[in-house]
Design a protein with these regions (language model features):
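Amphipathic alpha-helical scaffolding segments comprising HEAT/armadillo-like alpha-solenoid repeats
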Residues: 1-12, 33-45, 64-76, 96-113, ...
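Short linear sequence motifs
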Residues: 2, 78-80, 107, 124, ...
Length: 207
């Protein structure tokens, strides 16, 4: 998108205003200019949780090295959701940069971090993201995550069925209908009526 001088001025002048910060992060998502990503990086330090997480997510649309470094630091956040979004945006930025050496390095680093990561939520976001970039072996890992998190002792502690639904919807394509439907059948006994209705009406899947 071409730079809008008026919007640029408004955002640079007022982006710390508490009433508009959240809207600013959403608006800046569609801007690729350096000034926009610079503001978003600043907003990843925001004390408002929603503003911060929106900024982390929006950085994923860019390809700046500074954004890559900031996101890598945020993967150490104690906040599970901030950490999760930082991982996904980090993958997006590396793929946007499209340097083979960086992609190989990121995958090696991510594999080591993944083994040490205790957050099942993070894994349920990261694995579909990798699958979306063509790493088909990620689907096998997703199946393992589904099997593990559908155990009653785990689902009573953390119900990730909504995340599983959205991940399957994201990964669905013309070549994997059967696999997607098999996973949906696995989680069906754990779904409530709202979730079943979403799959049948919004996603047009018959389960």
């Amino acid at each position: 998108m071409k730079k809008n001088n008026k919007l640029h001025f408004i955002i640079k002048s007022f982006h710390w205003n508490p009433d508009i910060r959240e809207k600013v992060t959403e608006e800046l998502c569609s801007y690729e200019e350096r000034w926009a990503k610079r503001i978003l990086r600043r907003m990843t330090y925001d004390l408002n949780w929603i503003v911060k997480i929106n900024a982390v997510e929006s950085l994923g649309t860019g390809q700046e090295l500074k954004s890559l470094r900031r996101l890598k630091k945020l993967t150490n956040s104690k906040d599970e959701l901030i950490r999760t979004y930082a991982y996904v945006s980090l993958i997006d930025v590396v793929m946007n940069r499209a340097h083979d050496s960086e992609i190989e390095g990121m995958l090696y680093w991510l594999k080591r971090r993944y083994r040490r990561e205790n957050s099942e939520l993070m894994k349920l976001f990261v694995v579909p993201a990798l699958y979306g970039y063509g790493y088909e072996e990620a689907f096998i890992e997703f199946q393992k995550l589904v099997n593990r998190n559908l155990k009653m002792e785990n689902i009573c502690k953390n119900d990730y069925t909504w995340r599983m639904i959205h991940a399957l919807e994201y990964m669905s394509n013309d070549t994997n209908h059967r696999q997607i439907e098999e996973e949906l059948r696995k989680i069906k006994p754990f779904l409530n009526n709202v979730q079943k209705n979403y799959i049948e009406t919004e996603w047009n899947k018959d389960i």
